[in-house]
Every structure is written in structure tokens, then in C-alpha cells.
């Protein structure tokens, strides 16, 4: 899958779950499960409930995503 196929949307982290998984409420009020992208894990970027994040979704599974950026 190429990077052109992903859907990027912003949201707020609601809850931290085990194994670097988070519940994120998107701007359109949907709640999805997200995991942290590898580069964020590599650079030890911490994500806490209440943080504003950018999420990538694939067209195949719109209920799971990947957190790619944490806004400051």
C-alpha cells in the first residue's frame, strides 16, 4: 500500500491501553484504537490522555489507526 492511500485525520487521546495502544476520539466523534508509529517509538515520544494527535487510517480498516504525530 502506498502512502497516497492513507487517510490522515486529527483527534484527541482518550485513554491509554496496554502495548502502546490508545483510544482516540477523532474530530468527527468516532472512537478508534490506535498504536504508535515506529519512528515515534524509536524517539521515545510519550503520549498521554488529552494529547492532540495526527492519525493515519487505511481505507481497508477504518476502526484501527496509527499515531504519526503529537501536536505540541
From Swiss-Prot:
Annotated CDD domains: S1_IF1
Protein name as it appears in the record: Translation initiation factor IF-1
The UniProt record lists the keyword Cytoplasm: yes
InterPro entries assigned: NA-bd_OB-fold (IPR012340), RNA-binding_domain_S1_IF1 (IPR006196), TIF_IF1 (IPR004368)
UniProt subcellular location: Cytoplasm
Domain S1-like: from-to ranges: 1-72
Keywords: Cytoplasm, Initiation factor, Protein biosynthesis, RNA-binding, rRNA-binding
Protein family membership: Belongs to the IF-1 family.
Role noted for this protein: One of the essential components for the initiation of protein synthesis. Stabilizes the binding of IF-2 and IF-3 on the 30S subunit to which N-formylmethionyl-tRNA(fMet) subsequently binds. Helps modulate mRNA selection, yielding the 30S pre-initiation complex (PIC). Upon addition of the 50S ribosomal subunit IF-1, IF-2 and IF-3 are released leaving the mature 70S translation initiation complex.
Any single Pfam family the record assigns to this protein: eIF-1a
Classification of source organism: Bacteria, Pseudomonadati, Campylobacterota, Epsilonproteobacteria, Campylobacterales
Top-rank taxon: Bacteria
Amino acid at each position: 500500500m502506498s502512502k497516497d492511500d492513507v487517510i490522515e485525520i486529527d483527534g484527541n487521546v482518550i485513554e491509554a491501553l496496554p502495548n502502546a495502544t490508545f483510544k482516540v476520539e477523532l474530530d468527527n466523534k468516532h472512537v478508534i484504537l490506535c498504536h504508535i508509529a515506529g519512528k515515534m517509538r524509536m524517539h521515545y515520544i510519550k503520549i498521554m490522555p488529552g494529547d492532540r494527535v495526527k492519525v493515519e487510517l487505511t481505507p481497508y480498516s477504518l476502526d484501527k489507526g496509527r499515531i504519526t504525530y503529537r501536536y505540541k
